[in-house]
Amino acid sequence: MSEPNGWVELDVPEPDAEEFTGPQPVVAVVGRPNVGKSTLVNRLIGRRQAVVEDVPGVTRDRVPYDAQWNGRQFAVVDTGGWEPDAKDRAAAIAAQAETAVTTADVVLFVVDAVVGATDVDESAVKMLRRSAKPVILVANKADNSSIEMEAATLWSLGLGEPYPVSALHGRGSGELLDVIMDRLPEAPKIIEDRPRGPRRVALVGRPNVGKSSLLNRFSGEVRAVVDAVAGTTVDPVDSLVEIGGEAWQLVDTAGLRKRVGKASGTEYYASLRTASAIEAAEVAVVLLDASEVISEQDQRILSMVTDAGRALVIAFNKWDLVDADRRYYLDREIERELRRIPWAIRLNLSAKTGRAVDKLAPALRKALASWETRVPTAQLNAWLTALVQATPHPVRGGRAPKILFATQAGAAPPRFVLFTSGPLDAGYQRFVERKLREEFGFEGSPIEIAVRPRKKVGPGGRGKAHG
């Protein structure tokens, strides 16, 4: 029967329990009525098959659907809304949901992130704990970043990290599928191998610092025009080269002499192309001329990379021209001019002679690994608790704000959210970031830390975050 929203209700016979226990792993989707379970199922399987309507009780039976993710095959079981102490028809629906739990390999417990945890959700948690099945807590309807941050309050259910998802819009669904693949007890069948393409590297720097010379060093041919005249490269030149036994997609970019806003003519368009190359890359190699003073324009280029959130390797080129005196002054310049990015990986090399060029590939790998690092929430909060106990926030106005908990909101670059009882001093925020890097690395990668001060929850409802 056609529904008002244009979706079609399928007459699917109820499967036997044996169908859930074969070699294909099974994921059961459970939760109280109308939290968006069927919408999530449709998102996971990549097509509209589960019946969806914005009223409770549309799904009554447990219905399996075939699905795949990154070449892995599994089954998703949609269930009706679970309620404690249900009667008559609702009791039968709840029983079907409990059967799906007992026959599944992994359970997705879906909670409405907008409403938050309810008494029914807490009762469902007790049922899930009795099943002893692996449970992934899904905070659905996280349609924007504000709701996504609020979803972290669902830690109170005691099921571990809540994964914010918008089943309707697809937000967070890829990350959730990755988590599901990690939790399945047996490796799903590999349908096809989809190798990752070469990592993209942008070579950036002001004119005549040796970007094209370095590119040609790797490519083994005169791939980019090299001239002693500054600015001979205008268009980005892509080259697929092998560095350290691995293929890399290198983008050589026009040298930047001026701010993009102040450049004109050819320089203006070259600057825009360079900015686009940085955005398209995963990691940037910023070349500086080691024989010259670190300039304001060098720092602007570094800012372009960090503002874009890309992994960063700083290569001091023309090291063959550096004598002992220049090394002394360069060390002082690094301390003074690059103090805001002490986390950047630094190399001293010579594209002309080949000195230390072999160190670039390990540096790129390390920077990218840091860029993609994820810290488990439990580990993050255990570390943070110890840090705050050892060095609490200074008292201001007779009170000291507390860091309630933290979560990593994303990677590439790593992004963290601190939920606090009040605003944190800028100095304490820098202290937390420094200690976070000391503990977990992130060498070669920027990290972002957002602070979410919260009001106390009053008797009338949920608290709200400032900002």
Curated annotation (Swiss-Prot):
Residues 373-455 form the KH-like domain. It comes from the Bacteria. The keyword Ribosomal protein does not apply. GO terms for molecular function: ATP hydrolysis activity; GTP binding; ribosome binding. The keyword Cytoplasm does not apply. GTP 2 binds at residues 205-212, 252-256, 317-320. GTP 1 binds at residues 31-38, 78-82, 140-143. Pfam families: KH_dom-like, MMR_HSR1. GO terms for biological process: ribosome biogenesis. Residues 25-188, 199-372 form the EngA-type G domain. Belongs to the TRAFAC class TrmE-Era-EngA-EngB-Septin-like GTPase superfamily. EngA (Der) GTPase family. Associates with the 50S ribosomal subunit. GTPase that plays an essential role in the late steps of ribosome biogenesis. This is GTPase Der. It comes from Salinispora arenicola (strain CNS-205).
